[in-house]
From Swiss-Prot:
Names of required cofactors: [4Fe-4S] cluster; [2Fe-2S] cluster
Catalysis: reaction(s): (4R,5S)-dethiobiotin + (sulfur carrier)-SH + 2 reduced [2Fe-2S]-[ferredoxin] + 2 S-adenosyl-L-methionine = (sulfur carrier)-H + biotin + 2 5'-deoxyadenosine + 2 L-methionine + 2 oxidized [2Fe-2S]-[ferredoxin]
Family: Belongs to the radical SAM superfamily. Biotin synthase family.
The name this protein goes by in its record: Biotin synthase
Biological processes, Gene Ontology terms: biotin biosynthetic process
Listed InterPro entries: Aldolase_TIM, BATS_dom, Biotin_synth/BioAB, Biotin_synthase, Elp3/MiaA/NifB-like_rSAM, rSAM
Function noted in UniProt: Catalyzes the conversion of dethiobiotin (DTB) to biotin by the insertion of a sulfur atom into dethiobiotin via a radical-based mechanism.
SUPFAM superfamilies tied to this protein: Radical SAM enzymes (SSF102114)
Entry binding sites for [2Fe-2S] cluster: 105, 137, 197, 267
Note accompanying the cofactor annotation: Binds 1 [4Fe-4S] cluster. The cluster is coordinated with 3 cysteines and an exchangeable S-adenosyl-L-methionine.
Naturally occurring in which organism (per UniProt): Porphyromonas gingivalis (strain ATCC BAA-308 / W83)
């Protein structure tokens, strides 16, 4: 079965839902991992994409996402502050570029950014572009096309908006906005000319079937940069007592995401520090070919130099030439 699926993918076909469910329950996980490895190398070669972020505005978010320490609905202990200055953002971007990182994103808490905040961040992006040639991304919540156009005009080429989890599971985790609102933001970003980055968090209590549903959903909306965060339960949030995924569950999820999205950059993201070095290497072997590196929001990230070495040891080349397609469904 694995060889049949692999041949079909190479010839332009797709994995079916029924096949994904069978692979998830198969006892021969190594065969699944090897197939995902070969598909990764066939479609994506040895390129590895890197990006970094700065938490440009922290805390006091009005949304009630159950996993998130930024929400003001919960009692998580995090630092809270307003927008960072353009000088601070530009300095961090230049520092990350010197470390060999290809992309840099401002990330801000909140449902959306006000027009005044958008103008302030446009100033930050202009300052970044004056300091360095790093590619600019943004993750600022649910934005209108008008606001996205301002960002695009000031150097932002990629917009990040995580769909977070399977459509069947999302309503149990967040009641203050919907995935349809996220999709509207993604489509607006594409209309102004931006690329899109959208993934989510695994290990929030969803089933393997829902992870597969999520992977197919991302495929259906043509996402080609997929951050795969691992829940790091944060004290004070509703998910603080959630049990961690097993290593096999995590690696199986990566393999299935690869077979369902063979042309995507699957990105190490938040919570990765929970994985052992051996599991991180195995994940890269199976299908991870991008990473957020540096300090990640309110969880512990991975330092750039260590990540660069890991990527090279796993047979990949860190490169800035990793653009994905710009426009699909408007």
């Amino acid at each position: 079965m694995i060889q049949t699926i692999e041949n079909r993918l190479i010839n332009g076909g797709e994995l079916t839902l029924e096949e994904a469910l069978l692979l998830a329950s198969s006892a021969d996980k190594e065969a699944l991992y090897e197939a995902a490895h070969r598909i990764t190398r066939y479609f994506m070669g040895d390129k590895f994409d890197t990006c970094s972020i700065i938490n440009a505005k922290s805390g006091n978010c009005p949304e009630d996402c159950k996993w998130c320490a930024q929400s003001r609905h919960y009692a998580a202990s995090i630092e809270k502050y307003g927008l960072l200055s353009a000088a601070v953002c530009a300095e961090q971007a230049a520092y990350n570029r010197r470390q060999g990182i290809g992309r840099f994103s401002l990330v801000a808490s909140g449902r959306t950014a006000s027009m005044n905040e958008i103008r302030q961040m446009a100033e930050s992006y202009r300052a970044i572009k004056q300091r360095t040639d790093i590619k600019c991304c943004a993750s600022l919540g649910l934005l209108s096309e008008e606001k996205l156009q301002i960002l695009f005009d000031n150097g932002v080429t990629t917009y990040h908006c995580n769909m977070e989890t399977a459509p069947s599971f999302f309503p149990s985790l967040c009641s203050t906005h919907t995935q349809d609102e996220k999709l509207a933001t993604i489509r607006a970003a594409r209309r102004v000319g931006m690329r899109v980055c959208s993934g989510g968090i695994i290990g929030m209590g969803e089933t393997m079937e829902q992870r597969i549903e999520f992977a197919f959903y991302l495929h259906s909306i043509n996402v080609y940069s997929i951050p795969i965060n691992i829940l790091q339960p944060i004290p004070g949030t509703p998910l603080e007592r959630t049990l961690p995924l097993s290593e096999e569950e995590y690696l199986t999820t990566v393999a299935l995401f690869r077979l369902i999205n063979p042309r995507a950059f699957l990105r190490f993201s938040g919570g990765r520090a929970q994985l052992s070095p051996a599991v991180q290497r195995k994940a890269i072997y199976i299908g991870i070919n991008a990473a957020i590196t540096g300090d990640l929001l309110t969880t512990t990230g991975s330092k750039a130099a260590e990540d660069m070495q890991l990527v090279r040891e796993c047979g990949f080349q860190v490169t800035n030439d990793t653009d994905w397609e710009v426009s699909y469904d408007h």
